[in-house]
């Protein structure tokens, strides 16, 4: 399956590709651990975080619920639920499916300045 990046910024990825790429991400993160736990960025980071957690044998998964899309248009990032267990992020791994503008990452970095942040994909500028 050929993936074409179109003008609408759609980035179709199959479940098999997401699984394979999430496992590959876990293998790259292996030498950076051990991690106390994973913070999955909802909603996109939930599936990759589960795969990474399984590969790295991490049993503690916290969520950070953020929203930047309102009625299908991008707006300011809103924190719906912080990852309270992660505190400043020391020895925690933040997982999201993709980075687009970087705004979500900036908010997460302010919340957890000592965490390691990783995404499966990055959209081209």
Each PLM stretch: what is its role?
Residues 1-125:
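PRPP-associated nucleotide enzymes
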């Amino acid at each position: 399956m050929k993936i074409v990046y179109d003008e609408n910024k759609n980035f179709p990825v199959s479940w098999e590709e997401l699984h394979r790429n999430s496992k590959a991400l876990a293998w790259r993160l292996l030498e950076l651990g051990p991690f106390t736990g994973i913070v999955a960025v909802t909603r996109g980071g939930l599936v990759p975080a589960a795969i990474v957690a399984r590969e790295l044998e991490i049993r503690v998964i916290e969520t950070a619920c953020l929203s930047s899309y309102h009625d299908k248009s991008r707006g300011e990032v809103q924190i719906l639920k912080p990852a309270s267990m992660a505190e400043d992020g020391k020895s925690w791994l933040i997982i999201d499916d993709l980075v687009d503008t970087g705004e979500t990452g900036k908010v997460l970095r302010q919340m957890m300045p000592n965490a390691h942040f990783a995404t499966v994909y990055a959209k081209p500028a």
